[in-house]
Design a protein with these regions (language model features):
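Positively charged, low-complexity intrinsically disordered leader regions
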Residues: 1-26
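Conserved phosphate-binding/catalytic region of the ribokinase-like
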Residues: 2-8, 160, 213-341
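Histidine-anchored nucleotide/phosphate-binding helix
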Residues: 40-50, 155-161
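Alpha-helix C-terminal capping segments
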Residues: 43-55, 76, 287-291
Length: 341
C-alpha cells in the first residue's frame, strides 16, 4: 500500500439488513426470519478486505442496536468504520430487504423496505476533507445514485473529489429497474463517467440503458473511446437452474488495447447468489490494486471470487486469498481432486 495512504479502498453506499425465511420457506408463510448484513458497496469492501487489503466504508447508520449489528459486521471483516456515521435522529433506521430463495421452476424474490433510511441523508458536509486523500481507490455503484436525495449528490461529489485527489475511481452500474428508469440511470451515470477509471457494466445494461450497438467487445471498447476509462469489465452468467450456474467475464484494458478472457466456471452449485457480482468486483479490484494494474490477475481473482461466493450463504463473501489462489490454480490446471487433505 502507498505509505501516504491510509486505505487501499474506500467504498460508499447503503448498508442493508437482510431478512430471509428458512431455506425453501416462503415469506408469505414462514414465521422465522434470519438476519444478515449486506449491501452492494459493503460487499465489495468486505471482499477486498478478505483478500488482504485495507478497506473502509462510508455511510450512515442508526445509533441503536441494529446499527451496532451493522457496525459489528464491519469489524468482523476488518473493514474500518472511521467514516461510518451514526444517526441519532429518533426516526433513524437501517434499510431492509427481504430475500426469498427458490428451487426450479420458481425464482428467488426480493422485497425492499429502505425508504427514509439513515444512509439516504448522508451529505458531503458530514465528511472530513482529509478523506479524499486517504485512499488509493474509491468504489460506489449506480444503486447509490438511484437512491436519490442527499446521498446521490454526495456520491457524485465524492467521485469527483476522490478523482481530483488522485484515487483510482471504480464504478459499477448495477442497474435496478425497481429503483429508477433506464433514462434516469443513463443521465446520472453519464455525469460521473468522466471521472471513472474502472467501469463495470453488463452487456444488457450497455444495450438497454446506454443504447450501445454491436457485439460485447465493441460496446466495452466504446466506453473507453467516449470517456477516459482505463478498464471495462463485463460478466456473463448462464442460469441453468436456481441451483446451477456458469460464470465468466471479459475485461478490456484500454491502455494495452487488449481483451482478457478465460474459461468460465461451469456448473457452480448455488447456495446463495446474492453478492456474487460484488465478489467479482472485489476480486477485480484486488487484482488491480494488489498486482500493479494487472488485468490478467484481475480477471482470475474476479471470476474465482464470484464463483466461490455463490457457495456460501449471505451477501458477504467469505474466502481468504489462500483459498482463492488454490481455486484459481485448480481452474487453470484442471485439478479435479475431490478433497483438500
Amino acid at each position: 500500500m502507498d505509505a501516504q495512504k491510509k486505505f487501499d479502498l474506500l467504498s460508499m453506499g447503503e448498508i442493508l439488513l437482510r431478512l430471509s425465511p428458512l431455506p425453501n420457506e416462503k415469506l408469505a408463510r414462514g414465521e422465522l426470519l434470519e438476519k444478515r448484513i449486506g449491501g452492494a458497496e459493503l460487499n465489495v469492501a468486505a471482499g477486498v478486505a478478505m483478500l488482504g487489503l485495507h478497506t473502509g466504508f462510508i455511510s450512515k447508520i442508526p445509533d441503536n442496536k441494529i446499527g451496532d449489528f451493522a457496525n459489528n459486521t464491519l469489524h468482523y471483516y476488518g473493514i474500518s468504520g472511521d467514516y461510518l456515521l451514526r444517526d441519532t435522529n429518533k426516526d433513524a433506521r437501517l434499510g431492509i430487504y427481504y430475500y426469498e430463495g427458490s428451487a426450479a421452476p420458481g425464482k428467488p424474490a426480493v422485497v425492499y423496505d429502505r425508504r427514509h433510511s439513515s444512509a439516504l441523508s448522508l451529505t458531503s458536509d458530514e465528511l472530513p476533507d482529509e478523506i479524499y486523500r486517504s485512499t488509493r481507490a474509491f468504489h460506489t455503484t449506480g444503486i447509490t445514485l438511484a437512491l436519490g436525495g442527499a446521498i446521490r449528490e454526495t456520491a457524485v461529489d465524492a467521485i469527483r473529489r476522490f478523482k481530483e485527489a488522485g484515487a483510482l475511481v471504480s464504478f459499477d452500474v448495477n442497474f435496478r429497474a425497481n429503483l429508477w428508469s433506464e433514462e434516469e440511470a443513463r443521465e446520472s451515470v453519464n455525469r460521473i463517467l468522466p471521472y471513472v477509471d474502472v467501469f463495470f457494466c453488463s452487456e444488457t445494461t450497455a444495450r438497454l440503458t446506454f443504447g450501445k450497438k454491436g457485439d460485447l467487445r465493441d460496446m466495452m471498447k466504446s466506453f473507453t473511446e467516449d470517456y477516459p476509462i482505463s478498464v471495462v469489465a463485463s460478466t456473463e452468467r448462464i442460469v441453468h437452474s436456481p441451483k446451477c450456474h456458469t460464470f465468466g467475464s471479459v475485461i478490456y484494458d484500454a491502455k494495452q488495447d487488449a481483451f482478457y478472457e478465460e474459461e468460465p466456471y461451469r456448473n457452480i452449485e448455488i447456495v446463495d447468489r446474492i453478492g456474487s457480482g460484488d465478489a467479482y468486483i472485489a476480486g477485480v479490484l484486488y487484482g488491480l490494486l494488489g498486482h500493479n494494474g494487472d488485468c490478467r490477475k484481475a480477471l482470475a481473482y474476479g471470476n474465482a471470487y464470484s464463483a466461490m461466493k455463490n457457495t456460501v450463504p449471505g451477501d458477504l463473501p467469505f474466502c481468504t486469498r489462500k483459498e482463492i489462489d488454490r481455486i484459481i490454480a485448480r481452474h487453470h490446471d484442471g485439478d479435479g481432486a475431490e478433497m483438500d487433505r
